[in-house]
């Protein structure tokens, strides 16, 4: 099976390593936008910038240049770029015959569209889906046990992802609910900022549990309003990804919350990370999409107010705690 992974960041590299390591019959091409970066990775057999010290398996090769030509000869194409770059990538892949799956999580800034909605706009002929779930790149690359979800309305896409990645260290489940999986991936990043803030302010385990639970309710309400299945949010791409991103210190979104709790500005927090924290860029869009369908998301609203400088860290908590009493709704 020939697998092409577009994007040589931490996550794209990790999945390329995973695919090449667990099946010797796989030929894996990792595409890097920068030709010098590609040459350096191919020569040194590692990604020193994002996953230093992790050697590439023999079946993994690094390329650059014409990505559409590379994809044209693939059995599966995986797009490992951030949400902001997805539209441009899909436009260049329009007409590709191979199944295509993206890894990004969030709603598109400006349009508020989910990834599959962007694909329907710019490349409707593609057989596409999303590969998501509770997974840190470092742990996937080092073959620590992980479970993920391959979601697509097309069985060909789901089956290709299972064939490419299911192995001793990575269990892949299939789902038809691409809406639910994408909503879970977008909202959990925003909620992880809130949980990081909570932990940074040392508000205790009770507060953390409340935030995660009520955050899951917000995620579910939005997902149902957009056509998702309720059971998806109890699975890997919902509750699973939320728990990991909200509590794991490898989470960039959680670290944004921790840094804001220390009194850093948003610009300082983002600069100190050195990598993209999708929740910072998708929070406003999540709230806008929720308002458009009449869904109340008070935690996400407070995160947006914090990121926009309308609230300070302690004020964010006070706003949530001072809301009027109500019945517990999911």
From Swiss-Prot:
Residues that hold NADPH according to the record: 11, 33, 105, 137, 252, 276, 278
EC assignment: 1.1.1.94
Protein location: Cytoplasm
Catalytic activity: sn-glycerol 3-phosphate + NAD(+) = dihydroxyacetone phosphate + NADH + H(+); sn-glycerol 3-phosphate + NADP(+) = dihydroxyacetone phosphate + NADPH + H(+)
Annotated sn-glycerol 3-phosphate binding sites: 105, 133, 135, 188, 241, 251-253
UniProt-annotated catalytic positions: 188 (proton acceptor)
Pathway: Membrane lipid metabolism; glycerophospholipid metabolism
Lineage top rank: taxon: Bacteria
Keyword set, alphabetical order: Cytoplasm, Lipid biosynthesis, Lipid metabolism, NAD, NADP, Nucleotide-binding, Oxidoreductase, Phospholipid biosynthesis, Phospholipid metabolism
InterPro entries: 6-PGluconate_DH-like_C_sf, 6PGD_dom2, G3P_DH_NAD-dep, G3P_DH_NAD-dep_C, G3P_DH_NAD-dep_N, NAD(P)-bd_dom_sf
Single GO biological process annotation from the record: glycerol-3-phosphate catabolic process
GO cellular component, one term: cytosol
Gene3D superfamilies (UniProt xref): N-(1-d-carboxylethyl)-l-norvaline Dehydrogenase, domain 2 (1.10.1040.10), NAD(P)-binding Rossmann-like Domain (3.40.50.720)
NAD in keyword set: yes
GO function terms (MF aspect): glycerol-3-phosphate dehydrogenase [NAD(P)+] activity; NAD binding
Keyword Oxidoreductase listed: yes
Annotated family: Belongs to the NAD-dependent glycerol-3-phosphate dehydrogenase family.
Protein function: Catalyzes the reduction of the glycolytic intermediate dihydroxyacetone phosphate (DHAP) to sn-glycerol 3-phosphate (G3P), the key precursor for phospholipid synthesis.
Name under which the protein is recorded: Glycerol-3-phosphate dehydrogenase [NAD(P)+]
Species this chain originates from: Acidovorax ebreus (strain TPSY) (Diaphorobacter sp. (strain TPSY))
